[in-house]
Amino acid sequence: MIERGKFRSLTLINWNGFFARTFDLDELVTTLSGGNGAGKSTTMAAFVTALIPDLTLLHFRNTTEAGATSGSRDKGLHGKLKAGVCYSMLDTINSRHQRVVVGVRLQQVAGRDRKVDIKPFAIQGLPMSVQPTQLVTETLNERQARVLSLAELKDKLDEMEGVQFKQFNSITDYHSLMFDLGIIARRLRSASDRSKFYRLIEASLYGGISSAITRSLRDYLLPENSGVRKAFQDMEAALRENRLTLEAIRVTQSDRDLFKHLISEATDYVAADYMRHANERRVHLDQALAFRRELYTSRKQLAAEQYKHVDMARELGEHNGAEGSLEADYQAASDHLNLVQTALRQQEKIERYEADLEELQIRLEEQNEVVAEAAEMQEENEARAEAAELEVDELKSQLADYQQALDVQQTRAIQYNQAISALARARELCHLPDLTPESAAEWLDTFQAKEQEATEKLLSLEQKMSVAQTAHSQFEQAYQLVAAINGPLARGEAWDVARELLRDGVNQRHLAEQVQPLRMRLSELEQRLREQQEAERLLAEFCKRQGKNFDIDELEALHQELEARIAALSDSVANASEQRLALRQEQEQLQSRIQHLMQRAPVWLAAQNSLNQLSEQCGEAFSSSQEVTEYLQQLLEREREAIVERDEVGARKNAVDEEIERLSQPGGAEDQRLNTLAERFGGVLLSEIYDDVSLEDAPYFSALYGPSRHAIVVPDLSQIAEQLEGLTDCPEDLYLIEGDPQSFDDSVFSVDELEKAVVVKIADRQWRYSRFPSLPIFGRAARENRIESLHAEREVLSERFATLSFDVQKTQRLHQAFSRFIGSHLSVAFEDDPEAEIRRLNGRRVELERALATHENDNQQQRLQFEQAKEGVSALNRLLPRLNLLADETLADRVDEIQERLDEAQEAARFVQQYGNQLAKLEPVVSVLQSDPEQFEQLKEDYAWSQQMQRDARQQAFALAEVVERRAHFSYSDSAEMLSGNSDLNEKLRQRLEQAEAERTRAREALRSHASQLSQYSQVLASLKSSYDTKKELLNDLQRELQDIGVRADSGAEERARQRRDELHAQLSNNRSRRNQLEKALTFCEAEMDNLTRKLRKLERDYHEMREQVVTAKAGWCAVMRMVKDNGVERRLHRRELAYLSADELRSMSDKALGALRLAVADNEHLRDVLRLSEDPKRPERKIQFFVAVYQHLRERIRQDIIRTDDPVEAIEQMEIELSRLTEELTSREQKLAISSRSVANIIRKTIQREQNRIRMLNQGLQSVSFGQVNSVRLNVNVRETHATLLDVLSEQQEQHQDLFNSNRLTFSEALAKLYQRLNPQIDMGQRTPQTIGEELLDYRNYLEMEVEVNRGSDGWLRAESGALSTGEAIGTGMSILVMVVQSWEDEARRLRGKDISPCRLLFLDEAARLDARSIATLFELCERLQMQLIIAAPENISPEKGTTYKLVRKVFQNTEHVHVVGLRGFAPQLPETLPGTQTEDTPSEAS
């Protein structure tokens, strides 16, 4: 039998009055005896402190403070300690004979709060010879010792071999160790458990009936049916988990779509961007290479353009220089043409003026003759008029004389006046102031003679004038001609000069005749010279373009060579066109083929992805469509086999579930009907009675009872006989055994035990041999063991079933995948790799592009050579006909020579043209120049003077004649009028006068008209002379201007000048055109160079930027690739089919996915933030982080109890497989897990019955307990009425409330709480939740009401209350209750602690003086019967007869307070020896 653990001793170190005191504890009762203040309570306080070191619970008060809530501030502990380190230690021996020392180190904490610091510790493996005081003290001398600190204690124990020291930071750990080693009876897991234990100790210490315990006896006495509760909790948890799993499945079904949506959209979003970046990286690399190629090409082009620019600039400079000279030549030619035209116009004017002058000269000569004739006629008219005037005057005078004669006085007076007038006129005219009428006659003769002489002289001079005038006009004309030709000269030199001019004129005329031939010759030579110069220019240009100087003799050979080269290049160009066409056709075919392959590549890649997925899923590699179809047939066969095996495993699992369900019935009833029959018969199942049988005894009892192990034990068989009639709802064999269920044993059979078998003698003639079953199920332990093994088997079967179901689903899905693959991709999956073909074709395309580029360069060079050759041939075609000109080196000299001769001839022609008419006129009259009639003017003057003298003499003679004629009239001064002697004469005179006057009038009119005509003729002559002079001056001016022009104006001069100007204009135009072309070309070249420079800068910038971008992108791409590879998502993101989409398509795909993702992650803050961060186009790695975050988020949302993978994509596939199977399995599991309300009621009832039976057995132990008038103590256990109603409803009327228990929204606990509220609406549930209430209703303790009853005197059984009992009776009754509690705790803890440990039992009783001797004897008897230790504190007048007694006396010695302790054994004869602690009776322990 297992020995119970005991407390050996209590050690106090440095307590108030106890420096180092060890109290050896008795195995039953230890009594502390002493007066007030002796230290009894301090000793028990030290014990309690070591047992429960919880400052929140410890409160040591005396009886006067009982019930007080505010005692001393230190709660009684601080004042019981001395300053410094204090210890309280318990030395124990457990059932395993292990010595364990547990205790606490206490130390006062300085301050107003009077706190105490407590450190629990434990010592194991301490030898029996070592006393606790030796451990914690160090002897300094004979009378002094020092208390060790906890660290020093630890170091001291570490030096001892085999001793273990443990210090605890948690009271729970301290109590856990004490429970495991059997020091305390209950595992104190929480502060609530410690509080219960402390309340029990406190109730024991202060005695009496503790209201704190009696109010909660259920918590102290009734064990927490943790198994049932755990079963309920597990069932509910399983149901909850099942429902949560079902809900999770439903959520997962939606999550599946979310998974698909998230994965699809996230993959599209990230993969599109990933592939776009991959494509862009490739494109950027290609662009960088293209930029570099273009950069090199542009540099070459720029260099070529620079060379071309230099050549064109040089040529442009040459043309600019040539243009200046050509412009000067052209301007000179234009000016020369203008001069020639001006000279021609001048020449025309000169000729016109000369013709006009000749005409004017002729008209002038004619007019001179007309004027001369008119002058002569005027003179005649004047003479005639004078004669008529004279005749009229004479007639008038005659008529006057006649009338005077008739009238002497009048007439003579008139005559006299007239005579006087005539005399005065004669004096004036004749310049004779002394002239008198008498001398008039003489002077008349003189003057008449003078007149005659003047007339003769005038006639002579007139004759001379006529001859001189003819000679003078010829000489003057000839002289003027000579002066006009030669210029001013002396008149004497005119003859010689005229002859020289006539000779020179002949020569000049001969030279002038040679102008036209010379001009034609010069024009021809100049044309040849220009052609020679053009040929030289062409040759120089040809040599310049050819880059080599050629001799004239080499040109024909070069022409033939170029002709041959042109023919060869023409063939080459023609062949090049065909070759280029062939290359381009091949390139187009390649491009078309590549486009076709690029269109087919995504389909092929999709087929390959599907094929790879199939290969990964099935672990096979397929190389042909036939292998795929063959494997599909194998899949079908495998699916059939897996279905068969799954069905077999499912059947076995169902059988195991049924067996587990059968074995899980309450009370071990495999048939539910047995519980009903047991309740009906008022019996107990035999299996329930033996429910606590150990696993070792289970085979024996199973064989012992055999088929009757499911019997019902009834108190009286005779009472149920009638109930058996008509019983149908029962098993086929129903065994009934008569017996007391409370004290049933196996004595009903006669049994012989054999080896692993029994022989049961049922009757004299009937034996039964039963072997021990290999798997016994009799008793709870055996059933639990069997259920455990069945659960293990079920787990294996479930796992196998799940595996097989998964395999079947997987196989079916694989079959579907193969079917889809065959339907969609089989036709293209095993074709050649289009990407490999694309790579090969791209390589070939690159080769073709390179060949085309090379061909284009060669063709360009050939075309350039061809064009150069054609230009060379064209230039040579222009040059070859002019080779003779190029070879003619004297052409320029001949041109100069002819030019000189032409200049002379043109000079002669100009001389002839200018002076030819004068020379022609000079030639017939040149002879007149031999003598110069220079007296002509003098003669002309003499003639005029003679003519005037003759006129004056005539007038003088006439005036003198008139005076002479009127000489007689001078004498009539005194006379009268003379009368006429004949009237007829007067008449005749009058007639003649009228005729004379008429004649005079006519003469006057004729004179007047002739004078006007003469005046007109003179005016015409004057105008002609003026016109002649003017035109002569103009002619001279024109001739001078012509001479000033200095240009020979012949008939061909203008044509030659115009031809020269046009040639120069053509050359200038060509030069300008070429210059403009060069300028344009140069401008274009400069623009091209600028463009190339800008392009080059841009290319360099773009190349460097692209290179930097490529390098940066490479770093970013490396980071992206590293992140992709580290997270294992490359296979998800590198979707090769996306490589064939454009960047816009990929961006559109990514943007669409982004929009969908924004909606999908709108409720997820983390993914929303990561998604927002991933939208940065400059940080592509953030999209990978988002993808990883999505995968991580989906991994976290994957229920590992449903899906066995971390990959969300595989999770989707497994979801499809698992969801339907799990739904079915969990639905059936829920049906199996769901416990019926009847079963719950039965379980609670059975538990209540069992605990009632246990309480009755505890009551049997208290029946003999008596204290004073109390004869017996018992516990009364009743079921509450409201809860009994609940059990009845659960058992009999559960169908009425299935709306609660069949609801998937309510757990069983919540449904139970709802039912309780429905049945008891009057009860206020407060703020508690239905789940809390339901859990309380699942605890059977809440169904029971417990109260303590005592049998006291004549009152009989009544409720134990302090007011109804004496103090001693209350203490005894309370102690009895505490003993029941401790025993109940041990029974409850037996399942938790090892089977080989029986815990220590110890209670306290302070102030035991209230008990009488009989009551104390009862306590001693109770302790002995229950193997319990008891510490009693009693006054000095209490001396128990048994146990150990310590006498405590507090003394003061030398100002030092200490407690004197004397220990004695009990007075009973069986314990005569004195305890070791009593030997120091006279030697007090003193504190140093």
Curated annotation (Swiss-Prot):
Localization annotation: Cytoplasm, Nucleoid
One GO molecular-function entry: ATP binding
Binding site for ATP: 34-41
Gene name for this UniProt entry: mukB
KW Cell division (keyword) present: yes
Name used for this protein in its record: Chromosome partition protein MukB
Gene3D superfamilies in the cross-refs: 1.10.287.1490, 1.20.58.850, 3.40.1140.10, Immunoglobulin FC, subunit C, MukB, hinge domain
Family: Belongs to the SMC family. MukB subfamily.
Domain notes for this protein: The hinge domain, which separates the large intramolecular coiled coil regions, allows the homodimerization, forming a V-shaped homodimer.
Entry coiled-coil feature ranges: 326-418, 444-472, 509-602, 835-923, 977-1116, 1209-1265
Function: Plays a central role in chromosome condensation, segregation and cell cycle progression. Functions as a homodimer, which is essential for chromosome partition. Involved in negative DNA supercoiling in vivo, and by this means organize and compact chromosomes. May achieve or facilitate chromosome segregation by condensation DNA from both sides of a centrally located replisome during cell division.
Region (Disordered): 1049-1074
Keyword set includes 4Fe-4S: no
Main subcellular localisation: cytoplasm
Originating species: Salmonella arizonae (strain ATCC BAA-731 / CDC346-86 / RSK2980)
One Gene Ontology term, aspect cellular component: cytoplasm
Keywords, in A-Z order: ATP-binding, Cell cycle, Cell division, Chromosome partition, Coiled coil, Cytoplasm, DNA condensation, DNA-binding, Nucleotide-binding
Subunit structure: Homodimerization via its hinge domain. Binds to DNA via its C-terminal region. Interacts, and probably forms a ternary complex, with MukE and MukF via its C-terminal region. The complex formation is stimulated by calcium or magnesium. Interacts with tubulin-related protein FtsZ.
Region annotation (Flexible hinge) ranges: 666-783
GO biological process per UniProt: cell division; chromosome condensation; chromosome segregation; DNA replication
